[in-house]
């Protein structure tokens, strides 16, 4: 079986939810960003968290770059109008690769993006073969290829783009079983290789939600690498050194873009992650 790469022991701070805490937005097109939020919360439990997901335009992997940039800026603006933000995390690889410049130009608070963990994977691989598992959009974008050229030019990079895996992760959080046969079919190009990747980059924030199932399908000894812990450390540093004094004593809250039955069914899941309520955010559909 494969193994999940651990990032070491991360200290936790005592939470004081009744006091004003820095407000941090974690945004994704779907629920994949919860994997990043979980890493940040583990390191920084005493923040006021907002989780926003775009269930109207989900998934972003097949959308144009222009659409994604305009949409993400619009949503972050709408959240900022409700709650002044100390920091925002774009917990979506696809959105991060195209929207960060526009967000950083518009807002005066730090904006953290998520990029595939190519650099650490290149350092970890023993056989020199690294797999990148991401959306088709992330696989195709020039930013991803620039990361590979910069940090993994001596490695053999095998890329798989899958929208279906995003859907599988969403379904899992809705309580559905994940088909191992479906994962085997998606991963077939690697599973058929004489020497498959020994290190796999989870290049979509949805995919850590499937790590348990991936461990059952990938060859024994395969390492899974994602950027969640690194994003948490970056968030902590920015909050200490560069973030504005934007705080709230309110409870953590989640926003969807449309209050559909599917979104309502996510409330128990969101509550397990510490978000007491789910509201519709007023943006143009």
Swiss-Prot record:
The keyword Glycosyltransferase does not apply. Substrate binds at residues 28-29, 60-61, 93-94, 205-206. The active site is at residues 92, 204. It catalyses: L-glutamate = D-glutamate. Coiled coil: none annotated. Disulfide bonds: none annotated. GO terms for biological process: cell wall organization; peptidoglycan biosynthetic process; regulation of cell shape. Its EC number is 5.1.1.3. Pathway: Cell wall biogenesis; peptidoglycan biosynthesis. Pfam families: Asp_Glu_race. Keywords: Cell shape, Cell wall biogenesis/degradation, Isomerase, Peptidoglycan synthesis. Provides the (R)-glutamate required for cell wall biosynthesis. Belongs to the aspartate/glutamate racemases family. This is Glutamate racemase. It comes from Escherichia coli O6:H1 (strain CFT073 / ATCC 700928 / UPEC).
């Amino acid at each position: 079986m494969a193994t999940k790469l651990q990032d070491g022991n991360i200290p936790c701070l005592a939470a004081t939810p009744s006091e004003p805490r820095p407000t941090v937005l974690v945004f994704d097109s779907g629920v994949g960003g919860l994997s990043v939020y979980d890493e940040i919360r583990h390191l920084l439990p005493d923040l006021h968290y907002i989780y926003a997901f775009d269930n109207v335009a989900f998934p972003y992997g097949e959308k144009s770059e222009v659409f994604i940039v305009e949409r993400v800026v619009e949503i972050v603006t709408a959240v900022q109008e409700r709650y002044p933000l100390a920091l925002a995390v774009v917990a979506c690889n696809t959105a991060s690769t195209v929207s960060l410049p526009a967000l950083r130009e518009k807002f005066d608070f730090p904006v953290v993006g998520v990029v595939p963990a190519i650099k650490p994977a290149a350092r970890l691989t023993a056989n020199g073969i690294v797999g990148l598992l991401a959306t088709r959009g992330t696989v195709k974008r020039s930013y991803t290829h620039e990361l590979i050229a910069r940090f993994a030019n001596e490695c053999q990079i095998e890329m798989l783009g899958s929208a279906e895996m995003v859907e599988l992760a969403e379904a899992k959080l809705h309580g559905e079983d994940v088909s191992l046969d479906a994962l085997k079919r998606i991963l077939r190009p690697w599973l058929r290789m004489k020497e498959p990747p020994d290190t796999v980059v989870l290049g979509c924030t949805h995919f850590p939600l499937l790590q348990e199932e991936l461990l059952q399908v990938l060859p024994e000894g395969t390492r899974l690498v994602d950027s969640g812990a690194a994003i948490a450390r970056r968030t902590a540093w920015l909050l200490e050194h560069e973030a504005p004094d934007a705080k709230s004593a309110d409870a953590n809250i989640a926003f969807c873009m449309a209050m559909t039955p599917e979104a309502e069914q996510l409330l128990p899941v969101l509550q397990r992650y510490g978000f007491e309520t789910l509201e519709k955010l007023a943006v143009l559909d």
